[in-house]
Amino acid sequence: MRKANKFSTEKRLGYKKRENFMGFDVGTHRIGYGVIYWNKSGPKILKAGMIVKDKKFSFLKDFKKIEKLIKNVKPKLVVLEKIYFSRNVTNALSVAEVQGLIKYACEKSKVKFLEVHPKSLKLKISGDGNADKNDIKNSVNYLLKINKKFKTDDIYDALALALYGSMFI
């Protein structure tokens, strides 16, 4: 694994006026989310966790959970991973539907969103466009100085997406 990129706090103006950046990692059964902000010492975690999707496929319940989270956090930008191709079309469609809910919640809350290609995310966060899940986890731990372990990779991926988004504002 290559050494993770060290963000320059001098280049980041986000710590002068606190801005939150949010990432969503959408899966077929759960949604990982991560929210970061910057201060003088670098990026910090504000909130991270999981939304378990409704088993009865109630889009309204899922939407309300997502909308409430976005309204509470008030992010400057929400970042999603772009769906580029999937061998399992059913899973890809399920993920796309939830991403649509997230985009709608962003539009409704007047929050900008960005979709990023997985290779671009991996390159920016770990320095390697072909990084695996473990490399991303290690890079996120390093960049955010995380002391605890999260239960799933979805949370690490969501935090990586939030970090990615914070570099573009």
Language model features by range: what are they?
Residues M1-I169:
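Phosphate- and other anionic-substrate recognition elements at nucleic-acid/protein interfaces
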